[in-house]
């Protein structure tokens, strides 16, 4: 009976032999004995070859055994001591830890850069909002006066019938004033006190759901409203000779009135809900409304954002913050009117208003900090956003702008001032009585204060815009030379006459046409000169060719037109940073005039970019160097090919030439020459 046992990592065969007197176990190490017999001659040869190996091996074995014995004798105290005294070498991963530290610093700087953009965006929103209350009534009165006076002049034939009664700007001002006053008069018929008590009688859950529905509706109407207003303005000011495909001006006026009325009613319900939450004895509704911002944080942080998406989100946050500030101002007016303008009630409700506004600001900080952290966006991106708003500001301050500033702000941030202005006028009209002269004097002072504030905001915003544009253009001017590293910089060389320059150009072109580089076993070495040689000592062997601008691909221009104003050429429009659809990649080329602003205007010369050495012979050129029939076929095939819109890569061969070359005789590779 045989069995197998594992002992000391080896296998032993045990045979049990039975006899008459009892049993005896014999251990038979067959495999071990055979292995020892096989290894014995080899070990003797090794010992004879290296007699000093045995003592060294013995000492190593002794050290191993002693180390094993020491390891076996380690205690828990030794383990605890090693864990308590273990060292750290952080400098071995210095780059990773430095990057982590910079990310933390960038995370902490995000609120500062975000608030700079927020302040500038709120300035533009306030400028557009105050325009409705200050300058629009004056422009509306001027438009009405122009309409009446010009109509009377046409009746008495003091004005020709071919002239338009109103300019496009006057038509837009007239329509804005009519819409604003009509919706305001309709909203004054709504009883705000009854709406307040109806909302207050509802449960907290119903009010929470209703407030969320109002927020969603506000965003949807803001996205839809500006298109309605733009359609009305274009329909009213469209030229008569153009093809009219619309419903008519009255239909668009009706659409716009319905939109402004619905949006104004929605904002009125928002202000009433916020008023109930602030003035209620149970602060549960206010707490739920504040906690609603954290739901927005959850829905925004864990999404992927790029520069354009983050810009839209940031502009939406600017609009929401300004919108919330105006709503809180309306709530304060309504509450103070109910408590007879008591300063005690103002001090009671002020902390709640600050809590709502501070929560909105804090959520914006955390949201943008984590969005930039997760999407690897730098904090300097908010400066680019501010620069884009600066270009919007300057574009609408021209004498004949394409649109009103409020319209452009609405398109950029989704802020439409008309509904919010209607609700504010309703709140002020119901809170203040105009029964005596003092009230009208206070109203006049308030109007003058609002106009002065709007003028100050315009001056500050426009000055900030000019400063940002100047800094942006300076950065672009400083970065323009670095983007043209392949073009050698022409230094202040010795003056050369036009005749000498023309002679040198002719000689250089002839020399370059006669020279060729033979491609052998070793590739040619290309040397790039950072500083070009002077005009009088130009080395032809460097393979530089000099040609005038008239021989380049750019069209010829007069000498007066060749002067370039770098500052004016780098000015961008409203969508300068984010409008990639305006660039045609097929027409992109290097503007030689940028590099020649310091040269003479008579004959301007540049160094052409040095050709690259190909990794293999030019198959098109080799095909042309063959017999005449094959070359003619290749030319015809090349002419039939469609025009390429992009460059072929250096290692990409010409496929038609390879097909035509298949029937021709082989060409020796060692004697081929390619002209660069």
From Swiss-Prot:
It is a multi-pass membrane protein. The chain crosses the membrane at residues 128-148, 170-190, 249-269, 346-366, 414-434, 437-457. Coiled coil: none annotated. Residues 633-647 have a biased composition (Basic residues). GO terms for biological process: positive regulation of cilium assembly. Signal peptide: none annotated. It is found in: Membrane. Residues 1-44, 625-676 are annotated as: Disordered. Keywords: Membrane, Transmembrane, Transmembrane helix. InterPro entries: Tatp1. One of its GO terms (cellular component) is endoplasmic reticulum membrane. Residues 24-38 have a biased composition (Basic and acidic residues). Belongs to the TAPT1 family. This is Protein TAPT1 homolog. The lineage of its organism: Eukaryota, Metazoa, Ecdysozoa, Arthropoda, Hexapoda.
